[in-house]
Swiss-Prot record:
It catalyses: a purine D-ribonucleoside + phosphate = a purine nucleobase + alpha-D-ribose 1-phosphate; adenosine + phosphate = alpha-D-ribose 1-phosphate + adenine; cytidine + phosphate = cytosine + alpha-D-ribose 1-phosphate; guanosine + phosphate = alpha-D-ribose 1-phosphate + guanine. GO terms for molecular function: guanosine phosphorylase activity; purine-nucleoside phosphorylase activity; thymidine phosphorylase activity; uridine phosphorylase activity. GO terms for cellular component: cytosol. InterPro entries: Ppnp (IPR009664), RmlC-like_jellyroll (IPR014710), RmlC_Cupin_sf (IPR011051). CDD domains: cupin_PpnP-like. This is Pyrimidine/purine nucleoside phosphorylase. Keywords: Glycosyltransferase, Transferase. It comes from Shewanella sp. (strain W3-18-1). Catalyzes the phosphorolysis of diverse nucleosides, yielding D-ribose 1-phosphate and the respective free bases. Can use uridine, adenosine, guanosine, cytidine, thymidine, inosine and xanthosine as substrates. Also catalyzes the reverse reactions. Its EC number is 2.4.2.1, 2.4.2.2.
């Protein structure tokens, strides 16, 4: 979905990796939470505290999923799912954006 309706948005950004990754928390009418983020070129490692679905909304990422040794490419309109309490890596060569939905 390219448009989120009837939401509340946190004014304060979540800033990671010296400002190279930034996201905003979005709270939907049903009480669920998503984050919308921008990632500058680089390689980053993240950890999850709950299950997530990461949708690439612009650009592309290469992703090293948990327990994998092969980087996989995800481009605009694609997504990948992550379990709770895992670590994964992403890398990109140009600015990319994502929408993270929590399970």
């Amino acid at each position: 979905m390219s448009l989120l309706e009837q939401v509340s948005v946190s004014k304060k950004a979540n800033i990671y990796f010296d400002g190279k990754v930034a996201s905003r928390s979005v709270f939907l009418a049903d009480g669920s939470k998503q984050t919308l983020g921008v990632v500058l070129p680089g390689e980053y490692e993240f950890s999850t505290s709950q299950g997530e679905v990461m949708e690439v909304t612009s650009g592309r990422f290469e992703v090293l999923l948990p327990e994998s040794t092969v980087w996989q490419e995800f481009s605009e309109g694609t997504q990948f799912e992550l379990a709770a309490n895992v670590s994964f890596k992403i890398r990109n060569t140009a600015i990319a954006e994502y929408c993270c939905s929590y399970l």
